[in-house]
Amino acid sequence: MKVYSEPKITVPKFCEENGFYTTKQRSHNMSRIRGKNTKPEKLLKKALWHTGLHYRSNKRRLPGKPDITFIKYKLVVFIDGSFWHGYDWDTRKKSIKSNRGFWIPKIERNMQRDREINQYYLSKGWTLLRFWDFEVKKELGVCVKRVMDAIAVFP
């Protein structure tokens, strides 16, 4: 059984019996959201590949399924969606209008899981980089440089 450093946030199941309702259009929109190989991920992966860096994508055996993994350098890279991972959460959570009882615990649990994953990798001696999706889109060169710098300092 896993021991949490803070109380685990429980997220109610998203179903109509629990009072969470969704329209067919919303359901369709949500089904189109990708969990891997998003545009920001593809951008960063392509840029890294062009620099000659070779990596593994979405390594399932590693906790949190890192978007990019450099096993040789013990480096994992996560590209977090700003909504799903709680960018500017204190401000954003006020703007959620529907199904607040589901979405607020859902995002807060995602944030808690991110902290747990960070702690895991750091405790194992790995280097971990997290980029927001908009950082990759707007400052791709900076993100690539941070990855290359992390690799350069590897013993």
Task: Locate predicted features.
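Nucleic-acid endo/exonuclease domains
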Residues: 1-130, 134-155
